[in-house]
Amino acid sequence: MWRYREALPVEFDCSIVSMSEGCTALVEEVIGGRSVFIKNDTLFPTGSFKDRGASVLISYAREHSVKSVVEDSSGNAGCSIAAYASRAGMRCEIFVPDSTSQSKLNQIAAYNSRVKLVKGSRDDVAREILETASMEFYASHVYNPFFLHGTKTFAFEVCEQLGWKSPDAVVVPVGNGTLLLGVAIGFDELRSEGVVNRVPKIIAVQSKNCSPLLQAFNKKSDLPLPLKIEKTIAEGIAIERPVRGAQILKAVTRSNGTFIGVAEDEIVEAGIEMAGRGFFIEPTAAATIAGLKKYVTSSSSHDLIVSVFSGHGLKTDR
């Protein structure tokens, strides 16, 4: 990932906190009868794409002599921040919902980070951390823009792996939008530098049980809509009030993309199908594949489509 050093916001090489993350495989698979490419980001050190953002954010923190960080997460971002903080020799405390998968809690604790369980939803966790964050470096994957400058490397890698060209569409999960916004930033930068001549359509996938962005998009609203949320097995995108909602909606609209909702049984089915091909992915990643299956039926047969396995199945109890 740090091969794109000149495009990443860290000044000194000695500040870089890395575990040789990045350059994950771009796997060609047949989904819904169509050949597509899937970025296998389960191969990251902690098992999810969030390592992209954590590496850059913790490197930035190290460059500014930060000794202790806090973060709130539904799991994967907490694992990543905990791992990279540990590697940097920083103290770390992660706030998570009490419904977080035990495997993710075990992983966070293994990195010698403190885990604080918060009763309620992902949004309750975000509110809980604000008091602590006022006294510590808040290594937020949502609020801190340096995290997004890590996830933008997804776009750089895809472009390079495709022979320095842009795909027609990128299908990604969206909750707080850390990967989606990274994709938008990355391809915008590539276009600005003349590397590619267009930004791909961004296709955003949400669970129908928690789809404030999908509902807003369908009603042509610039902001996520308040609505009744039901439980979803795709805990990584179970975000009732995405704080970057307006930015996410704008990014999808500007790319001429769209939102797709998937049902719980479709998520389970996609996960089982991928496991049958040897890919053990978590429910959030399975939701993405379920959305991908829907998208290919409406896209041009000539379109070059890229998606992602965003997290490993070993990170979930379900």
What are these regions (language model features)?
Residues 1-318:
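PLP-dependent amino-acid enzyme catalytic core
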